[in-house]
Amino acid sequence: MYKEEYIEKANIPQNFKIYESRDGMFTDRIGPYFIKGRYPEVILGMRIFEHHSNLNGVAHGGLLMAFVDTIGGYVAAKAGESACVTANLNSYFMKPVPINSWIEGSGKALRTGKRAIFIRVEVMLNKSLVFAADGIWQKINREKGIPKS
């Protein structure tokens, strides 16, 4: 619904396709996100539109955090072979991201334990690091919605 009006405007680079979210309507509302490749070499991309901006006319920090949370969750689920939820996310804002920019993010599982996965996510704009995050994703039992013990 909402994302469809922006898909054509996104002018996506070659080899990206729409990312069909499995995490509910939230991602559909703030996107659209696009995906290229397969785990572990997957990249998510997004065009920054005016409605993604803050009062300074650049990408809102919360948007960037949601973007890396999606990437980290995707990587955690693949690396941990389990449904996961974000337990901790430390964010590092390096440079502002202007409206109409195309950003790309990728993540790497640094460590996979019995109950948690430690992930590093980086967001690039024109090959320049603009945002990064380190996080912990907790494995859960999707049916019960509780952490695995």
Task: Report residues per predicted region.
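Terminal targeting signals and extreme-terminal segments of soluble enzymes
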Residues: M1-S149
